[in-house]
Amino acid sequence: MDLADLVKDVKRELSFSELKGKRVSIDGYNALYQFLAAIRQPDGTPLMDSQGRVTSHLSGLFYRTINILEEGVIPIYVFDGKPPEQKSEELERRRKAKEEAERKLERAKSEGKIEELRKYSQAILRLSNIMVEESKKLLRAMGIPIVQAPSEGEAEAAYLNKLGLSWAAASQDYDAILFGAKRLVRNLTITGKRKLPNKDVYVEIKPELIETEILLKKLGITREQLIDIGILIGTDYNPDGIRGIGPERALKIIKKYGKIEKAMEYGEISKKDINFNIDEIRGLFLNPQVVKPEEALDLNEPNGEDIINILVYEHNFSEERVKNGIERLTKAIKEAKGASRQTGLDRWF
């Protein structure tokens, strides 16, 4: 769901110094897809090992997580569980979009169109269960806390934030705000220079912060009303939304009538355009399936041997680079723990 037009006046650039010593609950699937999209060879294909297995996600997870830790940020990776049944239409839409992109990719290959090769190679990204499990395995070896969500990862990341177990949720999507996150950090795992699609132009990507309380105050609405706006625009549970209604119009409607049903009562929205259960979708955001972690979400000492086994022996990473990464990781975890303790002490003074 795209709330970009509504958050543009309240989002702000976030420096890593502001994040130092703080825990951030990261939408793991979202981060892995970002790594798959960003870490590519010149022809647009992902990094692979000698057996042809994709390794872009592991490369991004290892090195980017180290970078984040070196800034004093403590990452908690949250992974999706079983998606709600209401998401099936959106998942089917994504599957068909990938099939169409695969056809266009083959055409681009036969015609030698390099830019289209890159474009459609990214569009066919798939994150398999094996890739997810090996990502978790790597994170455990690195000493990074992970949380397995019962359902939506973003909902769980937001829940950890609500519980005070993280300072913010991190994702490129805005759904975490609807799920109740107090703060949303974007661009945490993709900071750096990125090429604009279909242009030979690079832009600097920096972390952004959106604070829910400030957003709601600026818009003059409640979280429940923001959820209604999301439903009108279209969410993962009703991807088409209401035809002809974008973010600005949705905001005007909800501010005028308070909720979707009232707008329907006054004829602002036609009942025939509602082919989904409004209360059901609201419930998915207001009362999502989440779980309170039983284990402490602390950083642990990295297991260098396990990291080398996963990256070097299983996936042909450079042993020298990985060993250098382990040294950086060990030092960064030690310093991040110190920064976290200092942040805790600062609250008392």
Curated annotation (Swiss-Prot):
Source species of the chain: Saccharolobus solfataricus (strain ATCC 35092 / DSM 1617 / JCM 11322 / P2)
Region of interest (N-domain), residue spans: 1-98
Family stated for the protein in its record: Belongs to the XPG/RAD2 endonuclease family. FEN1 subfamily.
PROSITE patterns associated with the record: XPG_1
GO terms of biological process kind: DNA repair; DNA replication, removal of RNA primer
Gene3D superfamilies: 5' to 3' exonuclease, C-terminal subdomain (1.10.150.20), 5'-nuclease (3.40.50.1010)
Cofactor: Mg(2+)
Protein name listed in UniProt: Flap endonuclease 1
SMART domains cross-referenced by the UniProt entry: HhH2, XPGI, XPGN
Name of the gene encoding the protein in the UniProt record: fen
EC number: 3.1.-.-
Keyword Magnesium among UniProt keywords: yes
SUPFAM superfamilies in the record: 5' to 3' exonuclease, C-terminal subdomain, PIN domain-like
UniProt: Mg(2+) 2 binding residues: D173, D175, D236
GO MF, any single term: 5'-3' exonuclease activity
Keyword DNA damage: yes
Regulation (activators, inhibitors): Heterotrimeric PCNA stimulates the nuclease activity without altering cleavage specificity.
Binding site for Mg(2+) 1: D27, D80, E152, E154
Binding note for cofactor: Binds 2 magnesium ions per subunit. They probably participate in the reaction catalyzed by the enzyme. May bind an additional third magnesium ion after substrate binding.
Enzyme class, broadest EC rank: hydrolase
One Pfam short name: XPG_N
Region: Interaction with PCNA, residue numbers: 341-349
